Regions:
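Short alpha-helical "packing" element that flanks the helix-turn-helix/winged-helix DNA-binding module
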Residues: 5, 19-20
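Helix-turn-helix DNA-binding module
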Residues: 10-18, 26-43, 54-57
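Short, basic, alpha-helical segments at the C-terminal edge of helix-turn-helix-like DNA-binding modules
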Residues: 60-62
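IQ-motif-like calmodulin-binding regions
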Residues: 23
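Acidic, proline/glycine-rich intrinsically disordered inter-domain spacer in sigma factors
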Residues: 1-10
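Residues within the DNA-recognition helix of helix-turn-helix
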Residues: 47-52
């Protein structure tokens, strides 16, 4: 299952992959990721949710 998650993560574009990794794996908050990536925290949350949804869709097909 970890490999499937890694593959699903690799399907995301670079920025979304970084956001998902920082928020989910590393435990950063959206405002912290926003500072790191020079993004609005609401943009980080939107991209996180979209990235996770894309990963869910990929994993459901597997």
């Amino acid at each position: 299952e970890a490999t499937d998650i890694q593959i699903a993560l690799s399907k995301l574009n670079k920025t979304d992959r970084i956001i998902v990794s920082l928020c989910v794996v590393e435990g950063y908050k959206s405002h912290e990721v926003g500072k790191i990536l020079s993004m609005n925290p609401s943009t980080v949350r939107t991209r996180l949710n979209r990235g996770l949804e894309k990963m869910r869709e990929y994993l459901e097909v597997q």
